[in-house]
Design a protein with these regions (language model features):
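Bacterial N-terminal signal peptides
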Residues: 1-10
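Glycoside hydrolase catalytic-domain context in secreted enzymes
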Residues: 13-226
Length: 226
């Protein structure tokens, strides 16, 4: 029996799909999973099944994933397909200071602790993705969401976003850096045609996203609305 068990172990290891093998590079795992998905399954995973969730693929052991707002607090539970709160009597969350306050500290260690703390709460609530942090640069003072972002300085935002992302993802929760890119106002945000020259784009509006991806290793990015 012992010999048969010893032989079976390497056979099982060989049969284990690459996408389930945590020891393999993420690129290889993703490619392997994509090859196994049907068109219908791919479309379903890219489409929401509720306000804050998308379906998984049970036959491949891929779970559905659940998202929650940040960037400065976990959103209380909402109804399945509505924005109204679900009204759970035991539902509460920590309201963290806005990211503009965090950025004003110029303290990367504080940013790491902030991200770690909010990531812990997201994990406790069984969330897969935290919809934050936001790093859109302050272009106009009339943007009502400026308080959600890390200031008007691309260097400051670049230094503060990295530890935030790392702190969140220490908990196995994906940070979703937003909104890529040039989503710097809320007025007519679904129809605005943003015109920007290359120098402004690469020196002002993209550095924080670049740092989040290359240094912070963020697991997801949210597209802009413009």
């Amino acid at each position: 029996f012992g010999l048969a068990f010893a032989v079976a172990l390497p056979l099982f290891a060989q049969q284990k799909p690459a996408y389930l093998d945590a020891a393999k590079p993420i690129e290889e795992r993703v490619e392997d999973a994509l090859k196994r998905l049907t068109i219908e399954e791919k479309v379903a995973m890219l489409h929401a099944q509720s306000k804050f969730s998308s379906p998984g693929v049970p036959r491949l052991g891929i779970p559905e994933f659940w998202m929650t707002d940040g960037p400065h607090g976990i959103r209380p539970e909402v109804l399945w397909d509505e924005w109204d709160q679900a009204g759970w009597t035991n539902d509460s969350c920590v309201a963290f200071p806005a990211l503009t306050c965090l950025a004003a500290t110029w303290n990367p260690d504080m940013s790491m602790l902030y991200g770690k703390s909010i990531g812990e709460e997201a994990r406790y609530r069984n969330k897969t993705v935290l919809l934050g942090p936001g790093v859109n640069i302050y272009r106009t003072p009339l943007n009502g969401r400026n308080f959600e972002y890390m200031g008007e300085d691309p260097y400051l935002a670049s230094r503060m976003v990295v530890p935030y992302v790392q702190g969140v993802q220490q908990n196995g929760v994906a940070a979703c850096v937003k909104h890529y890119a040039l989503n710097n106002q809320e007025i007519n945000r679904h129809t605005t045609n943003v015109i920007v020259d290359d120098r402004a784009l690469y020196e002002i509006y993209l550095p924080a996203f670049k740092a989040a991806v290359q240094e912070g290793k963020t697991w997801s990015i949210m597209g802009a609305y413009n």
